[in-house]
């Protein structure tokens, strides 16, 4: 039995907290929202992030970070990507250095273009494990068979986290390509936003297939440029996560894109979704990154112009379709 603290009471963190509690672990959740904390502790629900599902008795919520992390064997950073650094700063010097930090966010730091594990390493001296893959919280909590990947620079810790989370319905693989795993999980959010836009525009299966396939090319292109391995992008954290995020009704990124494709402004679409849409910040970050390192990411480029420069979505699709001819494998 282990004690695991989740810093953030969002949907995926809550789903994993339920999973670990059902394995007879002691689970703490820190959340800054007192209403969320009280609801978890009193009603044993978290309706804001996980509707219609009960929280096991083994889960306790706290408003105090210090209380939540006290005695923890593992700490899970279950906050959005833009909060990762500030959360690490909040626990710096308050935990032993041998406690693994598990990152479940999918994105990069917008202002620095740094992967989230790098951000964590800059602030903390603890081992870092990244847990990523095609895993919507709504399905995990329903015990629908799910597969995911655990990765770290120190594979002993990746294997420990594999054992920690493995259940008959939640299968965890290990992969030593932490760069590829993180980049795949971040860029697929950009492609998922674009997938939602083309759905909102009313395009069909042919268009969606083209977007996913060429989106996969963008993921692998930037991932390899940053040091990831090609085969990683055709695994769970690349192709697998891309498929589920671009096609699922659960995907916040696809839903936001769908609303934008139907004519809603970015601001209004984000309000309608009501939760963090990582693809928006990732789009800006990867647009800046591809400009800096000099690689071609036409889907990301087009989405950026639509989101931040007000360009018409249909005209962006027309431009993509009328680019200079070239080999598919370029």
From Swiss-Prot:
Q: For binding sn-glycerol 3-phosphate, which residues are annotated in this chain's numbering?
A: 106, 133, 135, 188, 241, 251-253
Superkingdom of source: Bacteria
What is the protein's major site of localization?
A: cytoplasm
Q: What catalytic reaction does the record list? A: sn-glycerol 3-phosphate + NAD(+) = dihydroxyacetone phosphate + NADH + H(+); sn-glycerol 3-phosphate + NADP(+) = dihydroxyacetone phosphate + NADPH + H(+)
The residue ranges crossing the membrane are none
Where it sits in the cell: the answer is: Cytoplasm
Kindly give the InterPro entries that the UniProt entry links to this protein.
6-PGluconate_DH-like_C_sf, 6PGD_dom2, G3P_DH_NAD-dep, G3P_DH_NAD-dep_C, G3P_DH_NAD-dep_N, NAD(P)-bd_dom_sf
- GO CC annotation terms, alphabetical: cytosol
- Which PROSITE patterns does the annotation name? NAD_G3PDH (PS00957)
Q: Name one GO molecular function term.
A: glycerol-3-phosphate dehydrogenase [NAD(P)+] activity
NCBIfam families hit by this protein: PRK00094.1-2, PRK00094.1-3, PRK00094.1-4
Protein function: Catalyzes the reduction of the glycolytic intermediate dihydroxyacetone phosphate (DHAP) to sn-glycerol 3-phosphate (G3P), the key precursor for phospholipid synthesis.
Database matches in HAMAP family: NAD_Glyc3P_dehydrog
What name does the UniProt record give this protein? Glycerol-3-phosphate dehydrogenase [NAD(P)+]
Q: Which organism is it from?
A: Clostridium beijerinckii (strain ATCC 51743 / NCIMB 8052) (Clostridium acetobutylicum)
């Amino acid at each position: 039995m282990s004690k695991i603290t989740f810093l953030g009471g969002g949907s995926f963190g809550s789903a994993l907290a339920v999973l670990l509690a059902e394995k007879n672990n002691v689970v703490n959740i820190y959340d800054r929202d007192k209403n969320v904390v009280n609801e978890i502790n009193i009603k044993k629900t978290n309706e804001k992030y996980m509707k219609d599902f009960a929280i096991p008795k083994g889960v306790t919520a706290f408003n105090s970070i210090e209380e939540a992390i006290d005695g923890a064997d593992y700490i899970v950073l279950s906050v959005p990507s833009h909060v990762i650094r500030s959360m690490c700063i909040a626990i710096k010097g308050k935990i032993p250095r041998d406690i693994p930090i598990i990152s479940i966010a999918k994105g990069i730091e917008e202002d620095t273009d740094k992967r989230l594990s790098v951000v964590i390493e800059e602030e903390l001296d603890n081992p870092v494990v990244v847990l990523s893959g095609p895993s919507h919280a709504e399905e995990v909590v329903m015990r629908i068979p799910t597969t995911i990947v655990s990765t770290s620079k120190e594979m002993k810790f990746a294997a420990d986290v594999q054992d920690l989370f493995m259940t008959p319905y939640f299968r965890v693989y290990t992969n030593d390509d932490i760069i590829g795993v993180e980049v795949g999980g971040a860029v697929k959010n950009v492609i998922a936003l674009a997938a939602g836009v083309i759905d909102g525009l009313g395009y069909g299966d042919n268009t969606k297939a083209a977007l996913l396939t060429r989106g996969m090319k963008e993921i692998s292109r930037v991932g390899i440029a940053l040091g990831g391995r090609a085969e990683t992008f055709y695994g769970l954290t690349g192709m697998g996560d891309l498929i589920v995020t671009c096609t699922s009704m659960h995907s916040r990124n696809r839903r936001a894109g769908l609303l934008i494709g139907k004519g809603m402004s970015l601001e209004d679409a984000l309000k309608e979704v009501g939760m963090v849409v990582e693809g928006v910040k990732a789009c800006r970050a990867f647009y800046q990154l591809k400009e800096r390192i000099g690689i071609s990411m036409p889907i990301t480029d087009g989405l950026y112009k639509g989101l931040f420069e007000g360009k018409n979505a249909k005209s962006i699709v027309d431009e993509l379709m009328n680019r200079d001819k070239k080999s598919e494998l370029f």
